[in-house]
UniProtKB/Swiss-Prot annotation:
Pathway: Protein modification; lipoprotein biosynthesis (diacylglyceryl transfer). The keyword Membrane applies. Its EC number is 2.5.1.145. Catalyzes the transfer of the diacylglyceryl group from phosphatidylglycerol to the sulfhydryl group of the N-terminal cysteine of a prolipoprotein, the first step in the formation of mature lipoproteins. The keyword Cytoplasm does not apply. The lineage of its organism: Bacteria, Bacillati, Bacillota, Bacilli, Lactobacillales. GO terms for biological process: lipoprotein biosynthetic process. It comes from Latilactobacillus sakei subsp. sakei (strain 23K). It comes from the Bacteria. The gene is lgt. It is found in: Cell membrane. This is Phosphatidylglycerol--prolipoprotein diacylglyceryl transferase.
Amino acid sequence: MNLILGVLNPIALQLGPLAIHWYGVIIASGVVLAVVLALREAKRRNVGEDDILNLILWALPFALIGARLYYVIFEWSYYQANPSEIIKIWHGGIAIYGGLIAATIVFIIYCRKHFLSPWLVLDIAAPTVMIAQAIGRWGNFMNQEAFGAKTTLHFLQTLHLPNWVTDQMLIDGAYRQPTFLYESTWNVLGFIIIMSVRHRQGWFKQGEILLSYIAWYAFGRFFVEGMRTDSLFIGPLRVSQILSLVLFFGAMGLWIWRRKQQTLPDYLEGNTLRSAVK
């Protein structure tokens, strides 16, 4: 990683006029890891490799569009004045929640059409998305975005961060809270917990790994978002905090309701819809 005046160079490779940014490289790395993990788990749950690959091919472009559209909508005053910036995602400005919503819609439609349990497929995907998000936040780090309020060098040193991380948090003449790191760490912790218990007999019904992911991520995101300085707002309210509250209580409420109202298949049973149709 080259340095620009003590700051990490956001460009990984320059090929003539083509610049390959670390932001894209890091996000792509997270996606690749997520795909590998999802394929491994899908085999155990009687979901075909082709189904996973097809889902990814459909979901990724819509997730990218959804993530960008979400951001543009809530920053419309800027993009209305600068329409050429709308497609320049390498400048940053994609919202995770928008991407997750779009990808989930694609997953549900595909599963209904191909006799797959949407709950099961989303269970398989959820922890892999979580680790991809954790990795992707380091793309924000390279772009010096998604940071928090002003802090001191002394505070950052108490976190025992490498010097290159601390130096990157010097933005516009002031040290900033590394909120990208807080969210990344929260996601890694959630990933480890879910991966450690998801194969235990009787722990999860289908759909509950997904709901665990939603509740875990939304809970952490609510507090991290409160520290950020680049939040999207509706009036005085932070959009992501509102959505985090809705998702957290919605996920917990749906978990309780499903347990009370339905006889649910166990996660370890895998996909039974396709065999039932045959």
